[in-house]
Amino acid sequence: QNMDFFAGIYGLTGKKRLEAIDRLVSTFGLDSYLETNAIMLPLGYKQRLALACAVLHEPDVLFLDEPTSGVDPLTRREFWSHINAMVANGVTVVVTTHFLEEAEYCDRMALIYRGRMIAAGAPDELKASARSEDIPEPTLEDAFIALVEKDDRQREQT
C-alpha cells in the first residue's frame, strides 16, 4: 500500500508503476511482507520500505536523514550497500548521520557543531587535518574532536 501510494504521488502509472514497485520489493527483500501493515513491520523493514518509497521515481538527488538510526549492524551495512549502488548509478545522496564510521562511506562530508559547519571535505582530508605527533594516524572521531576543540578555542577568543 505504501509503495502504491508513493508511486501515485510521484506520478507513476500503469506498467511503469507496477515494474518500479516489483523491482524495489525484490531489491529490498520485502516480498514476504507484502500483506503486512507498515506499522507492524520490524524496524529494519520499516527503514527498507521508507527507502524503497523514496526511490520509486528514480530521483537524481536523494536526502536521507539518519537512515540507519535504530537498526542492527547487519541492516546498517545492507542499507549502505543500497546507498552505494544508487551513487554508482549517478544518484547524488545527501545523508545526515551521527555515526562517524558511516561518514567514511561518503565522498565528502561536513561537520556540524553548535549549529555551524566547522569543516568540510573528504573524510581523508579531515583526518589529515588532525594528524599530529601524538596522533599520527587519526580516525574521523579524532578529527571531529580536534575540530570541535579548535572551534571552541576560536569562539572563546571572539
Predicted feature residues:
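Hydrophobic anchor residue at the start of the ABC signature
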Residues: 51, 79
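ABC ATPase "signature
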Residues: 120-121
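Catalytic Walker B motif of ABC-type/P-loop ATPase nucleotide-binding domains
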Residues: 62-65
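Conserved ABC ATPase signature
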Residues: 37-41
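Conserved ABC ATPase "signature" region
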Residues: 4, 8-33
